[in-house]
Structure formats: structure tokens, C-alpha cells
């Protein structure tokens, strides 16, 4: 006993002093976990010598990093992870060093038994995994297992049925062929880089593939012809309606079509010796009674008016001026 006490004092007396000094510093400084910080200061050699001296007969346990609080949190996180990832096939846990596949399966069963929601989520996920299939554009499945190919016309968005097929790939190929016929290079295809359709469709006989192509081409051709006929009928109806409206407007206003000679109304003013001629008409100066006469604008009414229109006064032709009356002007100047 005395020898063992001497060995302990000789080997660990300096280490204990170091631990005391570091412990006071750690407590004053503070940190996430005091125990982890304390034992992290020891070197691996000192820890190994201590374990071999005190536990010579017992084998050392597997090393675990962190304190008991950390391990507890790790277990809780692992449990939550397994509950959220409730699927049919077991997956390795987050920390594979402490758990094996047998423990993960047991934890999954416990989570399913503890919460019905987890069991329902596991069943739903398993159903999604087993029933997940590839979806194609323009293809839908009947409830009895057959596959239907459909496409919409770019003109009026009308749905066209392309046929019923045994496989989804055959229906997708029918849609691709119809889409290329309608839209050309702008079509969105299920198999844009397909070279040999027989390999994809699984048709050993080429006659089936040819029959599929002919059926789709005939369907698209007939639909396009029907759309053209409907457009032609609509255009004919529109033209007939426009012509009928034009005829009715012409019949309601016949005066537009009739042409009459253009005449001008002139008013003359008659007096004893002179006349006042204007394009607006003839008017009597003595009686001041207007007399309306319809006379063509190109031919003068009388010879006197023609002579009067030719009168030249000081080099200016004043025949068409409304105030032209030479006798009245001289009378005014004399007075």
C-alpha cells in the first residue's frame, strides 16, 4: 500500500497541481461545459497512463466524445430523425458509430407504435415509393390500366383523342408524332432524341409501329381539314353579312346615287338704268324685293349683263364686285 501511494504521489502530484490551476481559470472564465474543458487539457499520454494504472484488470470502454448531456441530445436528435424519416426500408442512422441497423429498425417500430401519425406517414411514403411511375406529356392512364394519348390544337385549344395504348411509352410516342405534325420544331416532345422507336416501344414487328404512325397521321389530317372547313364557312358568312348591310344602306339612301346638274342661285337688283349683279342673286333696287332665279353659273342671264360684266373701269374688271354701279357712283360723287 505504501509503495502504491508513493507511485501515485510521484506520478500525479505535478498533474494535480496543474489541474487545480486550470480549474480555477475555467470556472472564472466560464464555458459551455466545465467537465469537458477540464479533461481536454490533459494529454492523451497522461490519460492512458492513468487508465492503465487504475484499471489493469478491466478492459477500457469504447471512447465516446463529449459529455453525458451531449450524448443525451444526440439520442434525442436520432430519435426525431427516425420519426421524420419513417419509410419502409431502414436507413443507417446519423451516428453510425453508436447504432447499428438492428437498433434503427427497433427504434422505427417503437416510433410507429407510439404515434399513429408516424405509422401513417410511413405507410404513405412506402406507397409513394412503390407506385411512383414516370409521367409523360399528353398521356394519362385509365382506371383499368390502359394509357390514353391526347393533344390540344394550337388554333382553338380543342382536345383531340389520339388513341388508347397498352404502354405509356407508346402513348407518349403518339403524342410526340402529333405534336411535331402540328407545331413542327417548336413542339415539346417526350423523346426529343429518339432514333429507333421500336426499341422504346418494345415492338418486335415493324407493322405495329407503322400502324401507329398511320393512325396518328390520319387523325391529325382529318382534324386539320375539319378546322379549315369551319373557317371557310365562317368567312363566307361574314362576307355575306357585309354585302347585305352594304345593299341595305344603298337602298335606304337613293339620293346618293342620283346625280343632278349643279346650279347657282343669283339675285339681281333692277333699276331704271343699271343692274347690280352678284353671284348671290338679283335684287331690284327700287322695290327692294328679292327675286330668286336659278341660272347656270357658266352662262350669263341676259346680253345686258354680259355687256355689264365686260365694263373696264381704270383697268380693273369690276363686274363681279357686289358694289359695282357706275351711275350710282357718279351720282354720289356729284352730290
Swiss-Prot record:
Keyword field contains Transcription regulation: yes
Region (Disordered): 244-264
Domain of life assignment: Eukaryota
GO CC annotation: nucleus
This protein's record includes keyword Lyase: no
Record's subcellular location: Nucleus
Keywords, alphabetical: Activator, DNA-binding, Ethylene signaling pathway, Nucleus, Transcription, Transcription regulation
DNA-binding region: 135-192
Xref: SMART domains: AP2
InterPro entries membership: AP2/ERF_dom, AP2/ERF_dom_sf, DNA-bd_dom_sf, ERF/AP2-like
Biological process (GO), any one: ethylene-activated signaling pathway
Gene Ontology MF, one: transcription cis-regulatory region binding
SUPFAM superfamilies linked: DNA-binding domain
Family: Belongs to the AP2/ERF transcription factor family. ERF subfamily.
Function: Probably acts as a transcriptional activator. Binds to the GCC-box pathogenesis-related promoter element. May be involved in the regulation of gene expression by stress factors and by components of stress signal transduction pathways.
Listed name of the protein: Ethylene-responsive transcription factor ERF061
Amino acid at each position: 500500500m505504501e509503495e502504491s501511494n508513493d507511485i501515485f504521489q510521484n506520478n500525479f502530484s505535478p498533474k494535480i497541481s496543474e489541474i487545480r490551476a486550470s480549474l480555477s481559470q475555467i470556472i472564472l472564465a466560464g464555458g459551455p461545459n466545465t467537465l469537458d474543458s477540464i479533461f481536454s487539457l490533459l494529454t492523451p499520454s497522461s490519460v492512458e497512463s492513468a487508465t492503465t494504472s487504475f484499471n489493469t484488470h478491466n478492459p477500457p470502454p469504447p471512447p465516446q466524445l463529449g459529455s453525458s448531456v451531449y450524448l443525451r441530445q444526440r439520442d434525442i436528435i436520432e430519435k426525431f430523425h427516425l420519426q421524420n424519416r419513417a419509410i419502409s426500408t431502414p436507413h443507417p442512422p446519423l451516428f453510425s458509430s453508436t447504432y447499428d441497423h438492428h437498433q434503427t429498425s427497433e427504434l422505427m417500430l417503437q416510433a410507429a407504435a407510439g404515434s399513429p401519425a408516424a405509422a401513417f406517414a410511413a405507410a404513405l411514403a412506402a406507397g409513394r415509393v412503390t407506385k411512383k411511375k414516370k409521367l409523360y406529356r399528353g398521356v394519362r392512364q385509365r382506371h383499368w390500366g390502359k394509357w390514353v394519348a391526347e393533344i390540344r390544337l394550337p388554333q382553338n385549344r380543342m382536345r383531340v383523342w389520339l388513341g388508347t395504348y397498352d404502354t405509356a411509352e407508346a402513348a407518349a410516342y403518339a403524342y410526340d408524332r402529333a405534336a411535331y405534325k402540328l407545331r413542327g420544331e417548336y413542339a415539346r416532345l417526350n423523346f426529343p432524341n429518339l432514333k429507333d422507336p421500336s426499341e422504346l416501344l418494345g415492338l418486335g414487328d415493324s407493322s405495329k409501329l407503322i400502324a401507329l404512325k398511320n393512325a396518328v397521321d390520319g387523325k391529325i389530317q382529318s382534324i386539320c381539314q375539319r378546322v379549315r372547313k369551319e373557317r371557310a364557312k365562317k368567312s363566307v358568312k361574314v362576307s355575306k353579312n357585309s354585302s347585305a348591310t352594304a345593299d341595305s344602306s344603298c337602298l335606304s339612301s337613293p339620293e346618293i346615287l342620283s346625280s343632278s346638274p349643279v346650279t347657282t342661285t343669283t339675285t339681281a337688283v333692277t333699276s331704271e338704268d343699271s343692274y347690280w349683279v352678284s353671284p348671290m342673286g338679283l335684287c331690284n333696287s327700287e322695290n327692294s324685293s328679292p327675286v330668286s332665279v336659278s341660272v347656270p353659273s357658266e352662262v350669263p342671264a341676259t346680253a345686258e349683263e354680259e355687256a355689264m360684266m365686260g365694263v373696264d373701269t381704270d383697268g380693273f374688271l369690276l363686274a363681279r364686285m357686289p358694289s359695282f354701279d357706275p351711275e350710282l357712283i357718279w351720282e354720289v360723287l356729284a352730290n
